[in-house]
Structures are given as C-alpha cells and as structure tokens.
Amino acid sequence: MTQANNTVYTDLSVDELVKEALQRGEGVLADTGALVVETGHRTGRSPADRFIVEEPSTQDAISWGPINRKFPADKFDALWARVEAFNNAQDHFVSYVHVGAAAEHYLPVKMTTQTAWQNLFGRCLFINPEQFNPAGRDQWQILNVANFVCEPERDGTNSDGCVIINFAQKKVLIAGMRYAGEMKKAMFSVQNFLLPAADVLPMHCAANIGEEGDVTLFFGLSGTGKTTLSADESRYLIGDDEHGWGEGVVFNMEGGCYAKCIDLSEKNEPVIWKAIKHGAVLENVVLDANKHADYTDVSLTQNSRAAYPLEHVAKRSEANLGGEPNAVIFLTCDLTGVLPPVSILNNEQAAYHFLSGYTALVGSTEMGSGGGIKSTFSTCFGAPFFPRPAGEYAELLIKRINGFNSKVYLVNTGWTGGGYGVGKRFSIPTTRAVIAAIQSGALVGAETEHLDIINLDVPKAVPGVETELLNPRTNWADKAAYDEAAKGLAKLFIENFKKFEVSDAIKAAGPQL
C-alpha cells in the first residue's frame, strides 16, 4: 500500500523484513545469519519514560507512583496524532500479531513500526497466528516510531522518548525508542492489567514441560536464569518470560524468546546458541572481523540480547501452553551469599517471597542502573510490569497454588561462601542439578533443616549437588560473619515488607530477627 510518496509494507515475511532492514542500513548479518542491530544510547528499558493514561477504567485500578506514571488523556491524543503524522510521511511496516496463546485470552494487535528490524523483532516475540483475530475482538494498536523526537515541554513526556499505554483506546505509543524490548514489555503490562479480571494470574516467568506432561515455572528478574534454566534439552519449552496461569492451563503470552547474550556459550546454553540464526535479531552484540558474535564484549552494553521465534527451539510445546505447574520456582540472585541453593516454601512463605521479589540487578535491563550489581526487591519478580496493587497478584498466586497443590521452591543462582567479591557464584551445572531434583519430585517430603534468621527450610540432600553446598552457613569460613550477613539481609527483607498489608501469617513467613 502506498501513501503519498511512501510505502506501507504489510505482513512481510521474515526474509523480506531482513532484506528491507539490510537495504535501509538498519543492521548487518552475523555469520549465523542473524540480523545484528544497535539501539543507540538506550540499551535497556527506560522506566522513567513509561506512562499509563489516566481515565475512568484506570483511575482507581492502578497502583500509581514512580513505576506507573500518570499521563493526561488530552496530551496523549495530541502526541499520538503528531507521531502518527510523522510516521505516515515515510515508509513503515505493519504486522498483525497476537499476544497470548490461549484462545480465550489472546489480544489481537496491529503493530506499526518505522523500522523493518523492529517489525522483525515483533514478529520474533509476538505470536504469528494462522488466522488473525478469529474471535473478532477489539484490536489493540502499537505505534512504534523510533526516529520521532519528543519535546517534553510540548508533549508532556519525561525526555526525547516515551512509552505510553492507553487502555481506553487500546493503544500503545512508543516514540523515540530504538531498544525493542520496550514493545514486548508494554504489551506484557497490558495483559498484566487485563488478565486478573478473568481470574488469570499473569506472571514474569519462564515455563517448560517434562516428558510426562509436568510443568515447571521459573519466576525471576532479568539475569537470574529464567531463559537459561528453562532452555533444557531434556524438556519442552513453553516460553522464557511471560505467561498466564488460569484454571487448567499455563499459556505463553509470546511467540519467541528474548535471551541475554553476555558470556553466552554453546556449552552452557546450547538451546539458545542454536536458536541464533536467520530470522533472529541480535541487539547490541559486537561482531569481530569475520562477522562472528563476541558475547564477551560488553563495550556497547552488558544487556546485549537475542530475539528469536520459538520455532528456532527444537524441543518446544507446539501449542505454546501446558497444564498447571507441579513445581513453581522463584529464582533469586543473592549477592550476600546468605541464601541456600534451594529452599522448600509453604504457602505463606510463597506469598511472602513472591511479594518481596528479592534478587540482584545483574547486567540490568534498565537504563541508568549502571553496569554494577546491587540487591533489589521487585514485587512479583517484575514490579515494572504489574500495574495493579501487588496484593491482587499475590492472592491469585495463592489461589492457584492451593487449587493445584503446586510445590514452591526458592532457588539461589547467586553467591555462596561469602558475598559478591568474596564468595563464588553457584555454577549453572549446580543450579541445573537443583532444578532436575525439583522436577523429579526428589524434594517432595524431603528431610529438611531449618535456618533460623532467614526462616527457610533446606533439604538435607539433593541428588547431584554436593551436601556441603546446601547449608550456606557451612560454606563460610567465618561463621560469625555469616550470621551478621544473615541479620543484615533479614533487616532488608523486613524493612521492604512494611509496605504490604497482608495477614500476620504471611508476615511471619519471612526472615526474623
């Protein structure tokens, strides 16, 4: 379709999008055939530039604050018109996709992007349905115009770029943003607001299925191991990041994966390694003279990424969904070296640790967090993406766990034997052995040992894991130093948890001093 001197490219194939991106100088090909692009000064999400339009449907339903920032409806309309006019004056790309694999819960989306590569990214990450919108639902629109420059005084934005969600109009406006992860996370936030009304728990987690149909969920912030640990050659992948849990089903919201590439190796992450081929997009990955990706080079960012469709994963759930989970795993990257490699949680502890969302920002996906590593609490293991009050998600989690009798575990992929800089990080093979033990059922009813200050129960034996690793205190040369570190961590938990209005039973399930 042509509009006054420009072309609208609709539903191009992957090959055509790659060709357009190369012809327009948007990227280059790696030796694997993946398209390699750079995203400019933003190499991660920009939380300070994300807004939700305040209108009757959102006014009293959203937890407003520094994460969910209000944007006036009239300002949105003016900015949308301005960005749309800018985009319509040049070539752009349109694809029709779904968000949500379950037939009852998909959102039909018209995705418009200024660049070919961001359209390819969307085709990697969203679902490309055989038939678009068979239920005839109202359509959402994404308008993603990377080269538009916002003017804060005129547009009401925080900077030269913005991400604004308008629930009343079913629109997502992304302007001035080259980092494509904004697109997928915006639609995740949309589903996270809508799904609880349908009694579905939206989750920032990965999911996979065993040969017997048993499902495991992996909750965790970026860098804690969701993508790596769910990409298991012995199991079928559902997805690596965004899922819904309803009665009888866990479904992927996406049609692809978005893997961190820092230090990626074929040995440790063979599934991801093999998926990076023609049709995949590499963001901010440095190539050598032979067009070979150097995943150890962090000169552009620690948050280098690979986007690829699920079709690039040999063992996957063809239906993009599974049954309810037998095992729910909360992944935490503990910088203090205090937490054990695995703890078995009861329901109250599950609610406590879900609300706390304790972990570290590792090679953070957020702009402005720097390259360093620091501890953080992120409610529901994904605070930036959950617009409703946290308690609503926690109540749904407990309802789902109770309903299916799912077992819940806290798995530390961080440090042991001392804090960051002193101790050592658990190896991926060690964590994989912990996960395998959980999935085999070996820890159900296992004999445990109680750790007082952090108030956790650890199994006395885990197949494939050295026994001396299980109790973190025994790993520290200086036991008094461990106790002090444990008290310090407990204080952080207790201070963070003061903001939650929950039952005394849940409050008592956390660390105690």
Swiss-Prot record:
Q: Name one GO molecular function term.
A: metal ion binding
Location in the cell reads: Cytoplasm
Instruction: Give the coiled coil ranges.
Output: none
This protein's UniProt keywords: ATP-binding, Cytoplasm, Decarboxylase, Gluconeogenesis, Lyase, Manganese, Metal-binding, Nucleotide-binding
**What EC number(s) does the entry state?**
4.1.1.49
Protein name per the record: Phosphoenolpyruvate carboxykinase (ATP)
- Naturally occurring in which organism (per UniProt): Pseudomonas putida (strain ATCC 700007 / DSM 6899 / JCM 31910 / BCRC 17059 / LMG 24140 / F1)
Protein role = Involved in the gluconeogenesis. Catalyzes the conversion of oxaloacetate (OAA) to phosphoenolpyruvate (PEP) through direct phosphoryl transfer between the nucleoside triphosphate and OAA.
